[in-house]
UniProtKB/Swiss-Prot annotation:
Organism placement in taxonomy: Bacteria, Bacillati, Bacillota, Clostridia, Eubacteriales
Molecular-function annotations in GO: RNA binding; tRNA pseudouridine(38-40) synthase activity
Name of this protein: tRNA pseudouridine synthase A
NCBIfam families from the UniProt entry: hisT_truA
Active site: 52
Gene responsible for this protein: truA
Gene3D superfamilies assigned to the protein according to its UniProt record, in alphabetical order: Pseudouridine synthase I, catalytic domain, C-terminal subdomain, Pseudouridine synthase I, catalytic domain, N-terminal subdomain
Keyword tRNA processing included in the entry's annotation: yes
Matching Pfam families: PseudoU_synth_1 (PF01416)
Length: 244
């Protein structure tokens, strides 16, 4: 028995998320089909994140147990010959049997990309969120500071979560701006269901002036979902890195 770790890049546009489903196309389903083709084994993969449909990844981590004699580093090339064009294995290696892509994780980094311009977009919409109203990016940057540290993020969670606790620690949160392209980066020890997308929606409210900068701390502390921003679309969201 061997434990194989994979680092995976995928374009989430045409997937119904990571987690396997009976009828819908998912990243996990395609990956497990590829493993079956090269090993002859029905392996169950563990993913570091359960991304939603439309969410992308530059470095999703997964692992699976196999009896195959294929060298760990060779799974990358072998799997890539069986995977669709919107999934790529960046790295593969054999790891200790104790390693688990999800439960061994110490944190994750996500990015979210916004294009802020009045004119409609002709292309690239599957990788970003278009905001037409002018955003005050300096206020958005200041708002990031309120989220840093350990907080109860109940106000930033969509219904349907099975999380045992809504307390999380955000370790890094910053914005990069290049002309009308705004990239938001957020790292934490874990994220609640739709937490990143709702936090970004709250930042957009700050940027448009709908939410006052000084009210952000109250939104966090009050824990009332309706006081936070909208859950922005998934297409601007990218899993950048998983920490171990």
């Amino acid at each position: 028995m061997r434990n194989i770790k994979l680092i995976i890049e995928f374009d989430g546009t045409n997937f119904c998320g990571w987690q396997r489903q009976v009828k819908d196309r998912t990243v996990q389903g395609c990956l497990e089909n590829a493993i079956l083709k090269i090993t002859g084994e029905k392996s169950l993969t563990n993913g570091s994140s359960r991304t939603d449909g439309g969410v992308h990844a530059k470095a999703m981590v997964a692992n699976f147990i196999t009896n195959s004699s294929i060298p760990g580093e060779k799974f990358r090339e072998a799997l890539n010959t069986k995977l669709p064009d919107d999934i790529s294995i960046i790295k593969s290696e054999e790891v200790d049997m104790e390693f688990h892509a999800r439960y061994s994780s110490k944190g994750k980094m996500y990015s979210y990309t916004i294009v802020n311009r009045y004119e409609k977009l002709a292309f690239g919409k599957q990788y970003l969120h278009h905001v037409r109203k002018e955003l005050n990016v300096e206020d958005m940057k200041k708002a990031c500071e309120y989220f840093l540290g350990k907080h109860d993020f109940k106000a930033f969670m969509s219904p349907g979560s099975s999380a045992k606790t809504t307390v999380r620690t955000i370790t890094d949160f910053y914005i990069e701006e290049n002309k009308n392209v705004i990239r938001i980066f957020i790292s934490a020890d874990g994220f609640l269901y739709n937490m990143v997308r709702i936090i970004v929606g709250t930042l957009i409210n700050v940027g448009t002036g709908k939410t006052k900068l000084q009210d952000v701390n109250n939104i966090i502390n009050d824990g009332i979902r309706k006081n936070a921003g909208m859950c922005v679309p998934p297409n601007g969201l990218v899993l950048e890195k998983v920490f171990y």
